[in-house]
């Protein structure tokens, strides 16, 4: 399979998103190109201590290999003995202001090949938002943008991917969701290659429309140490999910991926507290009681 068209889309998407984020923040992203000795490489774009973003990364990677790691063949035995390539864009953004949510987006494609046999391929991706102080209109906007992006592919797609997102970004050991969700899909190959590629493009292209208006609305909201402290505590959940449950992180580390790029998703300042509970009736309690309850936002 010729994957040039895929690569052109993913690298273009990375460039467009970074340009919008640089315009929003005012500071440039660092560019770090890297080569993977086992095959492939990527471009990491990173901001740390920006005017608005405390830390953020927008990664493109295109990695190849002769055989797959255990995390992949355990769930898909048919992939054993196949060479593979994985390609995509992954980003996580951590604003400094606690009233501005963290966001994650990922779009990717995977192809596994064996001489004399048809390629096995699929797309995956999605986006989700993790507020610290929830605002209903922000969550509705984020979900409505996701819904609109997926509407051309059928009315059933958004509800299915929204539910999948709620299930995937869930901390089983805490019995709570990571945030307010969004959309998530994986192993997508039904309907043919073109439809799957178009759907993946639609998700990637919708990200800044879903997220930047939320940030623009909240970026000037005043905050103090109380809000920063709660933000750092809740960021701990983000770290727990990424290191314990996230399939992409585990695949990257097990397949000899670039550790600096894989762990770029982690926030810079995080706190843990033993058995901490929010004060009844507080804005912090509202996050748990209202926003960390999966519901129909759009």
Curated annotation (Swiss-Prot):
It is an enzyme of class 1 (oxidoreductase). The active site is at residue 104. It is found in: Cytoplasm. The record marks 173 as: Important for dimerization. Coiled coil: none annotated. Residues 238-273 are annotated as: Important for dimerization. InterPro entries: Coprogen_oxidase_aer, Coprogen_oxidase_aer_sf, Coprogen_oxidase_CS. GO terms for cellular component: cytoplasm. Pathway: Porphyrin-containing compound metabolism; protoporphyrin-IX biosynthesis; protoporphyrinogen-IX from coproporphyrinogen-III (O2 route): step 1/1. It catalyses: coproporphyrinogen III + O2 + 2 H(+) = protoporphyrinogen IX + 2 CO2 + 2 H2O. A divalent metal cation binds at residues 94, 104, 143, 173. Keywords: Cytoplasm, Heme biosynthesis, Metal-binding, Oxidoreductase, Porphyrin biosynthesis. It comes from the Bacteria. The keyword Repressor does not apply. GO terms for molecular function: coproporphyrinogen oxidase activity; metal ion binding; protein homodimerization activity. It holds the Pfam family Coprogen_oxidas. The keyword Transit peptide does not apply. Belongs to the aerobic coproporphyrinogen-III oxidase family. Involved in the heme biosynthesis. Catalyzes the aerobic oxidative decarboxylation of propionate groups of rings A and B of coproporphyrinogen-III to yield the vinyl groups in protoporphyrinogen-IX. This is Oxygen-dependent coproporphyrinogen-III oxidase. The lineage of its organism: Bacteria, Pseudomonadati, Pseudomonadota, Betaproteobacteria, Rhodocyclales.
């Amino acid at each position: 399979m010729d994957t040039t068209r895929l690569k052109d889309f993913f690298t273009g998407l990375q460039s467009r998103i970074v340009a919008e984020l640089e315009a929003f923040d005012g500071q440039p992203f660092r560019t770090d190109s890297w080569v993977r000795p086992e095959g492939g490489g990527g471009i990491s774009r990173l901001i740390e201590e920006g005017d608005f973003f405390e830390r953020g990364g927008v990664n493109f990677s295109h990695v190849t290999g002769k055989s797959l790691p255990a995390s992949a063949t355990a769930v898909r035995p048919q992939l054993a003995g196949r060479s593979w390539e994985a390609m995509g864009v992954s980003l996580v953004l951590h604003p400094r202001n606690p009233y501005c949510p963290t966001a994650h987006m990922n779009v990717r494609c995977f192809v596994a090949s064996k001489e004399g046999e048809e390629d096995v391929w699929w797309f995956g991706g999605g986006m989700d938002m993790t507020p610290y102080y929830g605002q209903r209109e922000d969550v509705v906007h984020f979900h409505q943008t996701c819904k609109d992006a997926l509407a051309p592919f059928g009315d059933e797609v958004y509800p299915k991917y929204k539910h999948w997102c709620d299930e995937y970004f869930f901390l089983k050991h805490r019995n709570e969701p990571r945030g307010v969700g969004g959309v998530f899909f994986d192993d997508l190959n039904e309907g043919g290659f073109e439809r799957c590629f178009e759907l993946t493009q639609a998700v990637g292209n919708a990200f800044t429309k879903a997220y930047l208006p939320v940030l623009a609305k909240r970026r000037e909201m005043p905050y103090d140490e109380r809000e920063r402290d709660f933000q750092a505590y809740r960021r701990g959940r983000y770290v727990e999910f990424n290191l314990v449950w996230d399939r992409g992180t585990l695949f990257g580390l097990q397949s000899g991926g670039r550790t600096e790029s894989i762990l770029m998703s982690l926030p810079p300042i995080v706190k843990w507290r033993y058995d901490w509970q929010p004060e009844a009736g507080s804005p912090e309690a509202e996050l748990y009681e209202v926003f960390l309850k999966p519901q129909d936002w759009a």
